[in-house]
Amino acid sequence: MQESSPIHGGGPSRLFILRPVATTLLMVAILLAGLVGYRALPVSALPEVDYPTIQVVTLYPGASPDVMTSSVTAPLEHQFGSMSGLKQMSSQSSAGASVITLQFQLTLSLDVAEQDVQAAINAATNLLPTDLPFPPTYNKVNPADPPIMTLAVTSTAMPMTQVQDMLETRIAQKISQVEGVGLVTLAGGQRPSVRVKLNAGALASFGLSSESVRTAITAANVNTPKGSFDGPTRSVTLSANDQIRSVDDYRQLIITWKNNAPVRLQDVATVEQAPENTKLAAWANQNQAIILNIQRQPGANVIATADHIRNLLPTLQASLPKSVNVTLLADRTTTIRASVDDVQFELLLAIALVVMVIYLFLRNAVATLIPSIAVPLSLVGTFAAMYFLGFSVNNLTLMALTIATGFVVDDAIVVIENIARYIEKGEKPLDAALKGAGEIGFTIISLTFSLIAVLIPLLFMGDIIGRLFREFAVTLAVSILISAIVSLTLTPMMCARLLNHEALAHQNRFTRASERFFDWVIAAYGRGLTRVLSHPWITLSVAIGTLVLTVLLYIVIPKGFFPIQDNGIIQGTVQAAQTISFNSMVDKQHQVTDAILKDPTVESVSSFIGVDGTNPSLNSGRLQINLKPFSERSERVQTIIDRLQQQAAAIPGVQLYLQPVQDLTIDTQVSRTQYQFTLQTMSLDELGVWVPKLTAELQKLPQLQDVSSDWQDGAAVAYVKVDRDNASRLGITMSQIDSALYNAFGQRLISTIYTQSNQYRVVLEQHSPNKTGLDPLHDIRLVNSTGGVVPLDSIATIEERNGTLAVNHIDQFPSSTISFNVAPGYALGDAVKAIETTQQQMQLPSDIITRFQGSTLAFQAALTSTIWLVVAAIVAMYIVLGVLYESFIHPVTILSTLPTAGVGALLALMISGSDLNIIAIIGIILLIGIVKKNAIMMIDFALAAEREHGMSPYQAIYQACLLRFRPILMTTMAALLSAVPLMFSTGVGAELRRPLGICMVGGLVMSQVLTLFTTPVIYLLFDRLAHRLRRPRPQEGEAQ
């Protein structure tokens, strides 16, 4: 049979080879679309993976944790508990504050959740206390998310109450209006108010009760509609001096008349302009300040949002008096930008390394140019798809593109190497391009779809990990797909136009030396392959040994969740004695801040004490430590944390808990440490028994450090035990007693002053400047219906007891959280196993439910799905290869290369001291797609040699190994060098990228050494097996 002319070949590439103008313009269109998409893409640290989270805050000044739980938190929880799509509800009820955090399923829209939350709050309104001064408010942000920017506002001349007023009316509202801002909170705010400090002795002398004062003030300060009327010719609106606005006017307010003389408020109380809440304070580097924490809206472009705020700051500063300064303390986007810049540099470095590898192997500038064009074209074209899919430029998508650098060039290398082989044999460039491209087309398709098949399981991963890596997988898949298109269109077209025999035959000293070197390497490989094929069972034993070793290494390697990043910001919690006073806590906070500011790596510190949505009690203070840029410090964040904790340990009466701020936040509450473990039961008393016991046992474990719990039942409680019979005889009711105590000690908000721009409160309290301990309680006097004054001591006894500082719930049941960090030298998996073992040994009661929270819970879920994820990737690739080859056997041969990659990756992780975390797992899955390329290129040529040239399986696979050795080595080196920049990352966020690079380099080195020998042996083994299965069983007569 006469062989057809090559001009009739070309397969899917034929049209593009013969139409160079159309091919060029198509590539230009891809390039332009990618550039436009890149300019429009948002920039972020990680893909948008936030759970829809809403925080509901209710303030009830003066209420104890028990009162907050029963009267505020429980009614709201009951309504929230019936909402669909609710994943978890946690609450914290402390003195004067109830904070409920609602975390919804990832599939639920935040806007839908917001509507449900508002409806639930409305439904609970009638069940809440009637004197609740503030209705429940909600925010569509995760309280555990660190702010994207932190501002400090200080003043050298103005009181903080005036500064607060300006912030609320001028600054906070303007920043809240910036696109992308989700919430602006003021920490340490000193809202102005009129404080009425009652004199118990003066009240008693006039025969007055605190309730009569409260009633008089409430009645005297009103702001209600008064109507209007029409006269004969005009309409008149009514107004009156029904409001009291100044402190002097309040002093002159008449409470009652005694002996025909007025009793004014100043006669029984001190009235002054003062902060609404005197137990809130914040500092910036030890200077009293109001801290503005700015949190982003879910899904917002964090870089654009921060830029808008920065552009707005000069205008805001100009609107303030000169004595008021706005200082930028922290900007999360600084490290995000630096991290993205580092990855972009590593991407460019990877491209340069890959191009260098291509030149070393092809040894021709023109031949190097052709596959080198495929790299930027494939990567830039991917940006267009990323834009239409709603992705962002972040660490993971840039990591995907960096790894793709080694992938996208592979196809072009395979094509150009095959075409160049025919040109070197003397064929015309056009004929060689048509013949070479047509011959290799199926291989390119096999390589592309089998590699994309590996990524398919990543798309179906559930929960937050699936969301996190979806952008990674799709970005990588799109770049691989575009590279295949480029390799089947542009690459052969350029080969036909640019390559010729003279250019390829041109040699210099470098090309001749490198040619001799490659010839020697191929000859050495051929001799080694001959020996290996003559001893197949030894090689097969090695292959089986790698599989066994992979399983063993997976069992023993430490397992983690997500690498701890150094983003230059540390969150801190200062914990003091449960009975500490506010003023003493201020002193402790200053001591800790002083010690931190002395550290040379610290740039600034903001601190806060008081009860708000993130801080549950007065005995804990919050810190945000901003480190100097990487260029100004040589130490990583964990080293700095260890040193700061050692310095704080010298301060008596406090414990300092520190953790680095992370890009990925799964938790729903601000914690002292990175990881949490909760106990949940019906009984608070049972928690009080077992939480301290378990905490004490966990503190003994070497795998853990910074172990603590939020169980605090040592608060000082003054229990007023009323003799009800005696009180009734004297005409005193429990309502009067509660009201008198609330008026005296609750910072009770009794009235509101309305202005054109803001509202201010009138606060009632008892003035007891020189009293200590429980003495102020002995000054309480009550007035019965006949006007008689009844001392509280005559109807009640005061007992000092212990009580809880906060009551925590998870899904409406009492709970307590044990926080911990992983000790150096251990992984999160070690810590989880140690906790589970300790829990089992202690034999907790069956009605106590234990559960890991946040990152640890996600780690457990990821750990159980890891094996299935790898299995799913292998099965998906087997199915694709089986369909492409129409064979059950050949896919098994190709997949036999995988254990070698697993061994190399796991050994590299162990040698480098890294744990097997989610990033490393992704690296192993990518290796599954890469290392099988070697087998595909060998088997494709072997099958073609058997089918078209009638070679024996031995001759076919032997020739395929030698012919494909150089492209196999070239593609592997390209993939390996694309991962080298990630492996040696040192900049911001390097902890996130390094495990991927380590896995890729270790797996590729090991697989490259072994698969060149194991694949042909297994190919021949399965070929013999297939022949035996196909050979018919001989008949009895034939046997004889």
From Swiss-Prot:
The keyword Amino-acid biosynthesis does not apply. It is found in: Cell inner membrane. Keywords: Cell inner membrane, Cell membrane, Membrane, Transmembrane, Transmembrane helix, Transport. The chain crosses the membrane at residues 16-36, 342-362, 373-393, 396-416, 440-460, 472-492, 537-557, 865-885, 888-908, 911-931, 968-988, 1002-1022. One of its GO terms (cellular component) is plasma membrane. HAMAP family: MdtB. Belongs to the resistance-nodulation-cell division (RND) (TC 2.A.6) family. MdtB subfamily. This is Multidrug resistance protein MdtB. It comes from Musicola paradisiaca (strain Ech703) (Dickeya paradisiaca).
